[in-house]
């Protein structure tokens, strides 16, 4: 098996780190800029059954290349994200001559820098939220939980390494997938759980399953906290060979057709037919189904959320563009029976959406104190 085929995606890593969580929130284009494909391999040493000693960065991995606020960005993290996002952009647009100085290449460089910075800020935004809420990110308890998560990943019989510490150590010292970077990601995952606990204790998350679920159900049914939608989705580059302009044109045709239908029921039937016919509306590409999507602020991308809230019931949007693709959205009325039957899931999503909003705000603050990485990106791409 090739080295490339051995790599885990960042989403797979987070699934492993968080697999005991009951988090069911779906993020389309927020935070993560949705989400988006990052590959990652984990390196560590298991010195004892219950104690895992970190693997030190190599000299090359440990070079500081910049800062985001107080957080030093090391060469391993920067180089890894540069490589992953460069591949994503070239998968989207085709092979790029990064030194040709064209307007197209400048646009791609800007997009690449934005993606890299967003990727770097994702974990540090969690640390900032911790500081704002009095959580010690470096406490013995947190470090113990991080060790447990990493050990769980290492010992996974279905994973790549299956407890082979030598294999972990060797891989963590090659390239840019260092143990230190993995620990940052694992710590962020652990801390998100702690932040949710703190928000519930403080009342910032006002509804708690064990205390006031009935009140939450009433709130969800009678307020505009939750919005229900369905949509047609066309990806930009998740399917090999997709022509972006062709996809945009197809989505625009659907949007225009829906807007030409005056009857609500006929329009609803039409979007469902469009969803069923769209080759990309498989479970891997869309969340749209007969129940629709129930979301509150912080769960979806900002563009998606604001567009949906501006629609009347059974109204449809123009084509909206996000990092991952094109959407045509229809707003649907809330189904109170659905809310009652799925209240626990909606409450869990509501709680995580509160955290997502805090992280979104922390990212905005970090962006204002972020170093300019454009020169370094260009240098690495053209050397």
Predicted features and spans:
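N-terminal targeting/tethering segments
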Residues: 54-177
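Acidic surface patches and DE-rich sequence motifs
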Residues: 156, 289, 322
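Solvent-exposed loop/turn and edge beta-strand elements of beta-rich ligand-binding domains
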Residues: 18-26, 72, 80, 248-259, ...
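Sec/Tat-exported extracytoplasmic proteins
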Residues: 82-89, 120, 124, 128-137, ...
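Peptidyl-prolyl cis-trans isomerase
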Residues: 253-303, 333
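Soluble non-cytosolic domains of exported or imported proteins
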Residues: 76, 107-124, 136-140, 181-190, ...
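PPIase-associated folding chaperone regions across multiple families
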Residues: 2-32, 41-60, 168-246, 298-383
């Amino acid at each position: 098996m090739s080295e490339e085929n051995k790599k885990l995606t960042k989403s797979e890593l987070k699934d492993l780190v968080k697999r005991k969580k009951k988090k069911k929130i779906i993020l389309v284009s927020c935070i993560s800029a949705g989400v988006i494909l990052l590959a990652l391999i984990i390196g560590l040493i298991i010195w004892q059954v219950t104690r895992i000693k970190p693997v030190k960065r190599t000299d090359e991995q440990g070079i500081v290349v910049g800062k985001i606020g107080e957080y030093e960005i090391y060469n391993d993290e920067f180089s890894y994200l540069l490589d992953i996002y460069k591949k994503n952009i070239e998968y989207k647009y085709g092979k790029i001559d990064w030194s040709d100085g064209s307007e197209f290449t400048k646009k791609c460089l800007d997009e690449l820098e934005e993606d890299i910075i967003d990727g770097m800020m994702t974990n540090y935004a969690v640390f900032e939220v911790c500081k704002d809420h009095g959580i010690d990110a470096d406490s013995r308890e947190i470090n113990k939980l991080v060790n447990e998560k990493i050990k769980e990943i290492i010992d996974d019989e279905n994973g790549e390494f299956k407890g082979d510490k030598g294999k972990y150590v060797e891989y963590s010292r090659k390239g840019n997938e260092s143990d230190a970077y993995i620990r940052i990601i694992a710590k962020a995952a652990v801390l998100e759980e702690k932040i949710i606990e703190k928000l519930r204790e403080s009342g910032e998350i006002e509804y708690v399953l064990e205390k006031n679920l009935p009140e939450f159900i009433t709130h969800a049914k009678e307020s505009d906290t939750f919005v229900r939608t369905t949509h047609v989705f066309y990806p930009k580059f998740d399917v090999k060979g997709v022509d972006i302009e062709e996809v945009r044109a197809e989505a625009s045709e659907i949007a225009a057709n829906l807007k030409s239908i005056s009857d609500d029921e006929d329009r609803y039937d039409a979007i469902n037919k469009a969803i069923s016919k769209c080759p990309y509306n498989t479970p891997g590409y869309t969340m749209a189904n007969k129940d629709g999507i129930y979301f509150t602020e912080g769960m979806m991308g900002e563009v998606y959320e604001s567009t949906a809230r501006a629609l009347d019931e059974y109204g449809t949007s123009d084509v909206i563009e996000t990092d991952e693709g094109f959407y045509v959205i229809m707003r649907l009325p809330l189904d109170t029976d659905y809310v009652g039957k799925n209240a626990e899931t909606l409450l869990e999503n509501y709680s995580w959406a509160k955290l997502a909003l805090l992280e979104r705000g922390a990212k905005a603050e970090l962006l204002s104190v972020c170093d300019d990485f454009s020169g370094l990106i260009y240098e690495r791409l053209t050397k």
